[in-house]
């Protein structure tokens, strides 16, 4: 098995079954499985798969985001509101970063950027004059995933 395939499989197994609170802990678990890797490689992989940290009894743990096939986004998005300068999306805890990444990729031409916390996303459109349209486009985009 190629190293990247083995690494992907092991990382998914660690996050889905055991969990880990730090990248160093993930490296240690990989090492115990005979897979040598660096913290920077783990960091890049976590970013690539949009891993999120979920609060729990033992502290925050890395987790894979729900797949679009497994869970519709409409259950993760609670509200989309805007004023004259900002769009605010409230999400389920731990999903804001993943959803913000989807929005960043889809709406790069119409937004300046997103800022995601644990359960809230702030979106700044390029122009205030199109904020209502941008908010509606984002809402329609997110609904596509929930049908």
Swiss-Prot record:
Compartment(s) of residence = Cytoplasm
- InterPro entries, alphabetized: Arg_repress, Arg_repress_C, Arg_repress_C_sf, Arg_repress_DNA-bd, WH-like_DNA-bd_sf, WH_DNA-bd_sf
Q: Name one GO molecular function term.
A: DNA binding
Q: Does the keyword Cytoplasm apply?
A: yes
Which pathway? Amino-acid biosynthesis; L-arginine biosynthesis [regulation]
The record's section on Pfam families has: Arg_repressor, Arg_repressor_C
The alphabetized UniProt keywords are: Amino-acid biosynthesis, Arginine biosynthesis, Cytoplasm, DNA-binding, Repressor, Transcription, Transcription regulation
A cellular component term, taken from the record's GO annotations = cytoplasm
One GO BP annotation here?
Answer: regulation of arginine biosynthetic process
Read off the PANTHER family from this record. Answer: ARGININE REPRESSOR (PTHR34471:SF1)
Q: What is the protein name given in its UniProt record?
A: Arginine repressor
The record describes the protein's role as: Regulates arginine biosynthesis genes.
Which family is this sequence assigned to?
Answer: Belongs to the ArgR family.
HAMAP family in alphabetical order: Arg_repressor (MF_00173)
